[in-house]
Structures are given as structure tokens and as C-alpha cells.
Amino acid sequence: MMEKTYPGDITRVHGIRVGHAQNASARTGVTVVLCRKEGATGGVSVRGAAPGTRETDLLRPGNLVENVNAVVLSGGSAYGLDAAGGVMRYLEQMACGMDMGVARVPIVPA
């Protein structure tokens, strides 16, 4: 059964897929936004009293990286940030990422 979508839903953007999992009793979860194979332009605004991030500095203007392959939004502190590693492994298997000549490196800020 297809879930109902609404105008403005991120899943209505061509080439974007979203997945989510949570553990309600542990009060944590993870959302993954996958971009089309060639990636998408990313941006970031880090806020909060004790934010934890991974690879978000890559998104600053003027850096070598122009596109991201996925974005991971997670809870659970450092363990939540490690979820980006699993997304990177998946994207590597799918041959997605920045072409470094000898390999493709998936760009997955969290």
C-alpha cells in the first residue's frame, strides 16, 4: 500500500528517497535521505547546545566536495553518527560517490 504524500513532501522530489527507523524505548532513531546517483547540492546549519556532526564541514562553500550522496539524521550521540558508516558501505556497493580515480567515496554528512 502506497503512503499518502502531501505537497512539499521531500519524497516528492525526483531522485530523493527517505528511510526511517526508530527505537521508541531507547528514545533514538535515524532518518536517511538518499540522493540520486550523481548526488545533490547539500547545505547545513548546525545548532544546539551540544551538537555532534560528521563530515558537515565538507558542505562549506569553497570546499572540493560539490555534492552529497545521502544525509543521515540520527539520535544516540556518537553511536547515532556511526549510522553514516552503514550508509556509506551501501552506497559504495552501489558505485555511488565522489570519483577519486581509484575508488568512489560516498559523501554522507550526519
Task: Cite the ranges covered by each PLM segment.
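Alpha/propeptide regions of enzymes that mature by internal proteolysis
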Residues: 1-110
